């Protein structure tokens, strides 16, 4: 088992290419959360904005691949489904210092919108990976 997810994989890739990365997420207060944070620190990623949720477990995914190389992914979002705009308000310094903000839709939509609006106000570029696919607000 390895820590991952779209955001985590992208953060590690950018750090390995020499970029400065602050990773914002929410994990459970469990072994998966602790292992993830340790991995990010070993990769040189700023973990100051990894929030811990004592009530919900870390998110997990099970990926199976069939004989035709088609995959099936089952996700239990766990604590990351509770990454709220109030958490991101605590990470405003990271948003302010960022050259680029990379997001995906594995966090609540109101949190995505909060970050996008905050980034817009601060004249920051945002890349949104719209996955998993779901309807987007016009705003």
Where are these regions (language model features)?
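Short, acidic/turn-prone active-site loops that include or flank metal/cofactor-
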Residues: 1, 78-80, 130-133
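Active-site nucleophile and cofactor-binding loops and adjacent substrate-binding regions
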Residues: 1-6, 51-55
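Active-site alpha-helical elements of protease catalytic centers
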Residues: 4-22
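Loop/helix-junction capping segments adjacent to catalytic residues or to phosphate/diphosphate-binding pockets
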Residues: 4, 30-34, 82, 109-110, ...
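Conserved beta-alpha-beta core of the PfkB/ribokinase-like small-molecule kinase fold
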Residues: 98-139
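A generic secondary-structure micro-motif detector
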Residues: 1, 25-26, 105
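Conserved N-terminal subdomain of the carbohydrate kinase-like
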Residues: 16-99, 115
């Amino acid at each position: 088992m390895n820590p991952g997810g779209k955001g985590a994989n992208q953060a590690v890739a950018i750090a390995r290419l020499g970029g400065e990365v602050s990773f914002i997420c929410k994990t459970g207060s469990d072994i998966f959360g602790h292992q993830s944070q340790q991995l990010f620190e070993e990769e040189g990623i700023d973990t100051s904005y990894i929030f811990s949720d004592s009530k919900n477990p870390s998110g997990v995914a099970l990926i199976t691949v069939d004989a035709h190389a088609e995959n099936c992914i089952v996700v239990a979002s766990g604590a990351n489904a509770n990454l709220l705009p109030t958490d991101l308000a605590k990470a405003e310094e990271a948003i302010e210092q960022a050259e680029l903000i990379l997001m995906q839709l594995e966090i609540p939509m109101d949190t995505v919108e909060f970050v996008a609006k905050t980034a817009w106000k601060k004249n920051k570029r945002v890349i949104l990976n719209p996955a998993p696919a779901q309807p987007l607000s016009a705003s």
